Amino acid sequence: QRQMCIRDSYGIKFAVIRNFRGAPVHGYISRNKDGMYQMITTIRGAYADIFWFSLFHELGHIVNGDIAKDSDFIDVSDGLDLEKERAADLFAQDSLLEPKSYADFLQRGDFTLSAISNYANTQNVMPYVVIGRLQKEKHISYSAYSDYKVRYGWANQ
């Protein structure tokens, strides 16, 4: 619900578009003269956990004030502004999984599917969000629970 408040309080128009071949872009944000943001993301890579992380990463750029009025912000993750990228990553991580509870979950060290599902339920996210983060942070291998990772696609593919 916090995220819906963010969208409403910042006035964000949101769209998901097809990724085009060769484009390194995960997201694009512009701000109109009236202050309304337009945020566009793709389902590049198709994994649902990556989509949701990317969505909250882009929201992080808005909340953190990275987009000036009348300018475009193309998030290519090319390392040109590591501080902004790290801050947006942190916003996404903390929005999806509450930091203290995630630290406690890691401390317990139980990464069974049952433990992951139970923890995901306490965070109001799908288990694939937790699985993706555990994989990214190398707590589990990328092959672990891969059958439980949802992939998005376009209806006419």
Mark where each language-model region is.
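Active-site hotspot residues in diverse enzymes, especially metal/ion-binding acidic/histidine motifs
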Residues: Q1-Q3, D8-Q157
